[in-house]
Amino acid sequence: MSKTQHKVNIIPLGGLGEIGKNMTAFRYGDDIILVDAGLMFPEEDMLGIDLVIPDITYLLENKDKVRAIFLTHGHEDHIGALPYVMKQINVPVYGTALTLGILQGRLKENGVSADNCHVIKPGDKISAGAFKLGFMRVNHSIPDAIALAIRTPVGLIIHTGDFKFDQTPVDGQVTEFNRFAEYGDEGVLLLMADSTNAERPGYTPSEKMVGQTFDDEFRYAKNRIIVATFSSNVHRIQQIVDSAVRYKRKVAVIGRSMVNVVNISIELGYLKVPEGVLIDVDETSNYQPSQIVIITTGSQGEPMSALTRMANNDHKKVEILPGDTVIISATPIPGNEKLVSRTIDNLYKLGADVIYEKSNGVHVSGHASQEEIKMMHNLVRPKFFMPVHGEYRHLVKHAQLAQSLGMPRENIVIGENGAVIELTRNSIGISGRVPAGKILVDGLGVGDVGNIVLRDRRQLSQDGIMIVVVTIEKNTCNIVSGPDIVSRGFVYVREAEDLMETAKEKVEQALDKCAENNVTEWSVLKGAIRDSLGRFLYEKTRRRPMILPIIMEV
């Protein structure tokens, strides 16, 4: 290989400048590996969209060069896009046991085989083309999270994945500090590190702190306790179970994703539940309210989640009763604040006692704060640094932290999705771009909804639609019947008869003018109807409904 080829290209396809859809490609010569393949949930204006996944055009164009996919942990923003990726790129997928356990459920739902998934554990070594990878245990808000040591012909890259330094983890499995330090002694060319909490000073509290809060709440609660949390936070679920056992309560689990993760975690040994503690939700009526704990989804106020349906008095099996204690063991993801607030309000209206503030100790982050981030840098001591996993301000703040530790600014690169970051032994910089963006998933459709469709949906949601049906004579364009106007989401027709009659007149005038000018092309006729009617409606209502002309010829 020539000297000009002694470079590694690092290509983030998602996860930079945003929270979610984490995916990064590493390329050396004709070999590509992929780290993570996550999704993100739609923004508020993405009407009707279920999921957002990264654009993998670059990977499809280089499909024959992709050697393997490596997963850092089992959160949706790191594995959620894999069912869509694996349908098109069939390569080995490596992850820890719990990560693959959760993934296999997703693959089954999407009709994708899990035969090419391979379990790894910290300390294992895997070769994939020119890359040799090692794996280190880290703490996060899900068990079995790992960081990656990626050996390349250019040098050693450390990718932290999502991490925090929890000195008292629930499962007793602390971060492998010694491994990071050993790599630091060996010499690390590039560190790629989690930036989510780069703005937060100090240290992220231990997960065990939440367990102490559960103990306090369980001790004094006189009726049922309902705890909403992320289904993937197995350590938190373990602490809920531990408190339930301590205070002689039975545990019921509600919510599809919660039930799935609990079953997988028990099967793989990550969740330890004494026999007889777990009961079906239908059995809760056989016990006193003071003997019951319900673990549920819905900590983000998701409209169809179990807790939201309970709060709306719309759940088939659980009715919120006065005196119930509801603990929301999570903080709202940005954009979900209103949904969570509405759920809390509705729970209070039903007479529940709701515990939800972070200051009450019912939630801690799964990401490193500034002092832990500094410790990671000091353990690894990289030559170059690239902040990852965060919105742009998080990346900038993380870069500033690295500089405060003595990293030269020219040795830091703040990338963006689609940037080709070229790494050599002596330099790092952005050398080009590849396609990167958001692929929208709507039902079974992947990528068939774009900006134009979203624009139409937004217009429909804001001002409604007006359908104009008119029949014209083929040669003269004279009106034979109609125009008839059907309105949905614009005005209630019976209360706006004058407006509708005048609207019909405007359509007639537009078509008469076209006939006078011998215009017979359908596209022109439809455009004339849209323009004339649109101007009139805006003048009268200051609204712009979607206007859909339907012209029939006889």
Describe each region flagged by the PLM.
Residues S2-F70, H75-N286, S305-E319, K338-R342:
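His/Asp/Glu-rich metal-coordinating catalytic cores
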Residues L16, M40-E44, K65-V66, Y356-S359, ...:
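A glycine- and charged-residue-rich anion-binding loop/surface
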Residues P92, M386, L548-P549:
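Short glycine-rich phosphate-binding loop at a beta-alpha junction
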Residues K121, E416, R543-I547:
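Short Gly/Ser/Thr- and Asp/Glu-enriched loop/turn motifs at secondary-structure junctions
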Residues E199-S329, I333-K358, V362-N518, K526-G527:
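Hard-cation-handling environments
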Residues N518-V554:
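C-terminal tails and terminal domains of large nucleic-acid-associated
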